[in-house]
A protein has these predicted regions:
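Solvent-exposed loop/turn segments at secondary-structure junctions
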Residues: 2-5, 60-63, 79-82, 95, ...
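Conserved C-terminal helix/tail region of periplasmic/extracytoplasmic solute-binding proteins
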Residues: 147-175
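Periplasmic-binding protein-like
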Residues: 8, 25-30, 68-92
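Sec-exported extracytoplasmic/periplasmic mature domains
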Residues: 14-19, 31-34, 48, 52, ...
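Short, hydrophobic alpha-helical packing/hinge segments within bilobed ligand-binding/sensory domains
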Residues: 43-44, 62, 100, 113
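Mature extracytoplasmic/periplasmic domains
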Residues: 82, 86, 91-147
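A ligand-binding cleft/hinge motif common to bilobed small-molecule-binding domains
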Residues: 53-71
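Extracytoplasmic ligand-binding site segments that recognize negatively charged/polar headgroups
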Residues: 1-51
Length: 175
């Protein structure tokens, strides 16, 4: 319940297969999971150390392990995959609105995003399409991205409901 990566995986599977088939798939997948982690990048790190055969993760985390020299190959499901969108917001009525807007514009500028995303430390894709990504970052044009429903699956009550169903119907199944 603590990993956003795990929730994105669950939401993706439910969107691809539909609720009934998606939950059936999750129950079958559960039997093959070695460890559930609290960190979204932990499964692929364990895979790199040889503790798991497969690690479900965001692509940039897999590529990062490969760049470290670990025996990890990153692939995307042919059925499609969900994704994350890094974002930032300004709180309505902020005391320092002018400065907040300045920082916002600065952080999202092509120059700053190019600097951050080509430093070799982050293999995520910049949110500003005019910024350059690290050459090793995943090429989203080669990946079958689903039409992820952020409105539905980003809703707090939907998330709580799905995680409750996971706790009650999937996590209790013996492995």
């Amino acid at each position: 319940n603590s990993s956003g990566t795990a929730y994105t995986t669950l939401a993706t599977i439910l969107q691809i297969f539909g609720e009934d088939k998606g939950w059936d798939y999750m129950k079958k997948l559960h039997a093959n999971i070695n460890t559930y982690t609290k960190s979204g990048s932990a499964p692929i790190k364990a895979t790199g150390r040889g503790e798991n055969l497969i690690g479900i993760c965001f692509q940039h985390d897999g590529v990062k392990q490969t760049k470290k020299g670990l025996p990890v190959v990153t692939v995307s499901p042919a059925e499609g995959t969900g994704y994350e969108v890094g974002s930032m917001s300004i709180i309505a009525g902020a005391r320092n609105m002018k400065e907040a807007k300045k920082f916002y514009d600065w952080a999202l500028s092509p120059a700053i995003q190019t600097m951050v995303f080509t430093s070799g430390k982050s293999l995520q894709v910049p949110s500003n399409t005019k910024a350059k990504a690290d050459p090793d970052a995943p090429d989203l044009s080669t990946i079958n991205l689903i039409d992820y429903n952020f409105k539905v699956y980003g809703d707090k009550s939907t998330r709580a409901s799905l995680l409750s169903k996971w706790d009650n119907d999937v996590s209790v199944i013996p492995r």
